[in-house]
A protein has these predicted regions:
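Conserved PLP-binding active-site segment of the aspartate aminotransferase-like
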Residues: 1, 282, 358-364, 381-419
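N-terminal basic, amphipathic alpha-helical segments
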Residues: 1-89, 295-301, 331, 335, ...
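Conserved glycine-rich beta-strand-loop-beta hairpin in the small C-terminal domain of fold type I
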Residues: 327-337, 347-360
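Residue-level detector of anion-binding/catalytic polar loops
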Residues: 153, 174, 234, 346, ...
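Conserved core segment of the aminotransferase class I/II
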Residues: 84, 257-327
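Hydrophobic residues in well-ordered beta-strands that form the structural core
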Residues: 156, 177, 235-237, 309, ...
Length: 425
């Protein structure tokens, strides 16, 4: 793809093999360009700045690391694997023939389940307002490609989802970060940004946000909708962690009933990341356009995947699984939070729900450098720079509580903290 080629060229520029010239292209670096070309005998280069795209690629490629406290998924034994296997067996034994394409909107039975679930949370939609996608990432991509034009100012959570930042920049948007707080948004900062810019959209994750796991209060949701109305921007609510929330609470979409809000959800976090089943709910005219764009860009999504997902969420044990998962996550939050506090970490928020804790330590000022060292010890951390709209050195780290209970992780952190204290002295 174009994105892959550009990414490869950017990596070669960062490594010193190519130079990029505005409005001209990429060229092989000559010896006269910025001193000596890379290679044997060349002087040592400065350490390049943290490369978030490269790090993201490593997260998914490097499966051999034994510890993954920085990852964005659950351990396989926390998921509903038995139900997935049952659904697959059922589909293979007496399911319909699946040698053709699926429906443009996606499997009708699953869309009806989604619509019923949203109705339980006070969002009135029918199945024709639901579009199934290959995970929430495709949903975000479709919405961005339909609604974002080159040069648009687009607001995002800061820190937030790095793939979204890349996606929006690739669409030509000017990406502006809105600082998160434990109760939602830094509203004075948001109002200052609205006075300085004319954003067309705000992509946000009010509930159990990654990486902070913060939860926007109802008051913040109402204020955000008021500001969207006053300043004329749309809202995209990425609510992929909703099933991990033990408290029934309103979403932006339920308060707005899809007037200004586009709602995105996913089953990948709680069933299996490999199933890649997400969805978009939107007003009917916009959803019809998203269906057309989905067909243009990749035809239908996998009906096999959607039928397997349907079998799982209609399994009689599905709700019990979610309840057990929430309890397990709450217990992990308490245990990991205690360990971090005992080591002297500062916690941004203590939600006791969702997957993450966002933490920093005064003696570990550079989480990117720490993450490089951790990789050598077989540990995949979640450095804060990865999630910032404008990457810069930071001590913040994202800890996935379901992967953060290995004693080797804590020994590594203790050693690095002690080393940091010795350097400071």
């Amino acid at each position: 793809s174009v994105f892959t080629v550009v990414e490869a060229y950017d990596r070669l520029v960062a490594q010193g093999w190519l130079v990029s010239r505005a409005n001209a292209g990429f060229f092989v670096k000559r010896r006269g360009d910025e001193g000596v070309a890379p290679g044997a005998g060349a002087p040592a280069r400065p350490v390049p700045r943290f490369d978030a795209r490269w790090y993201l690629k490593q997260i998914f490629e490097n499966r051999n690391l034994p510890m993954k406290p920085g990852c964005g998924w659950l351990p396989h034994d926390w998921l509903f694997g038995d139900a997935v296997k049952r659904s697959m067996r059922q589909l293979s034994s007496d399911g319909p023939e699946l040698d053709g394409y699926g429906l443009p909107h996606g499997h009708m039975a699953l869309r009806m389940v989604v619509a019923e679930s949203l109705a339980e949370h006070h969002l009135a939609v029918d199945a024709e307002q639901v579009l199934l996608t290959q995970g929430s990432s495709q949903a975000l991509d479709l919405v961005a490609r339909r609604l974002v034009k080159p040069g648009d100012v687009v607001l995002v959570d800061d820190p937030g989802y790095p793939n979204l930042h890349f996606m929006l920049r690739f669409a030509g948007a000017q990406v502006v970060g809105v600082p998160r707080t434990p109760t939602g948004y830094d509203l004075p900062a948001l109002e200052a940004l609205l006075a300085a810019h004319r954003p067309t959209m705000f992509f946000t994750q009010p509930r159990l946000q990654s990486p902070t796991c913060s939860m926007a209060s109802v008051a913040h949701l109402h204020r955000l909708l008021q500001l969207a109305e006053q300043h004329g921007f749309a809202l995209v609510e990425n609510d992929i962690y909703a099933d991990m929330d033990s408290t029934v609470r309103p979403s932006l979409a339920s308060l707005d009933q899809l007037s200004r809000v586009v709602y995105i959800g996913s089953f990948s976090k709680t069933i299996s990341p490999n199933l890649r089943t997400g969805y978009v709910a939107a007003r009917r005219d916009l959803l019809d356009e998203l269906v057309q764009l989905k067909m243009i860009s990749g035809l239908t999504s996998s009906e096999i995947t959607e039928r397997i997902t349907f079998g799982v969420v209609t399994d009689g044990r599905w709700r019990k699984h979610l309840k057990s998962l929430r309890e397990r996550l709450a217990e992990a939050h308490r245990a990991v939070g205690r360990r971090l506090l005992n080591l002297g970490f500062e916690l941004f928020h203590e939600p006791e729900a969702g997957m993450y804790l966002w933490a920093r330590h005064p003696d570990l000022p550079d989480s990117a450098e720490l993450s490089k060292e951790a990789t050598g010890a077989g540990i995949m951390l979640g450095p804060g720079q990865l999630f910032l709209v404008e990457p810069r050195p930071t001590g913040w780290l994202r800890f996935n509580v379901s992967f953060s209970q290995d004693e080797r992780l804590w020994r590594f952190l203790e050693q690095r903290i002690l080393l940091g204290q010795q350097v400071a002295e």
